[in-house]
Swiss-Prot record:
Protein task: Promotes spermatogenesis and ovulation by stimulating the testes and ovaries to synthesize steroids.
Protein name in UniProt: Lutropin subunit beta
Gene Ontology annotations of biological process type: G protein-coupled receptor signaling pathway; response to testosterone
Organism: Coturnix japonica (Japanese quail)
Family: Belongs to the glycoprotein hormones subunit beta family.
Amino acid sequence: MGGAQVLLLLTLLGTPLVTHGTPPLVVDPSIGSQLGLGSVLGLDLGSMGGSGRPPCRPINVTVAVEKEECPQCMAVTTTACGGYCRTREPVYRSPLGPPPQSSCTYGALRYERWDLWGCPIGSDPKVILPVALSCRCARCPIATSDCTVQGLGPAFCGAPGGFGGQ
């Protein structure tokens, strides 16, 4: 392996993979031609999203809605964002920290109001839920979303009466 090829290989190993758009072109001086990054590394970058994995999109979900002052949960069917987004896992530790990861989150949304059953007189039975109109892959907005690896799940009901009065 010549010096230029070793330098090219070291440069490629230290370069993070492209996660969107057209792969950059790399010129190999020993060949004198342009090669796509995927060709040099022997990867098919077009299929890294994984065939068979559903993309980020609005999906119908049933969630448990509850309020602290109301004794029961109510199952509500709404639209949320779900599916896969392309992520990167570094092969080396960077002093800059890990690369930002994207998750499937709301692009556009509207809000719907639901009234819970069995709430005591004088309490507010109204609950407002977001409804996904469109979704996108972006950094998880931790101020408004559950960005944990595995949350409680949409059907979790912590009310003492469980699901009642449907």
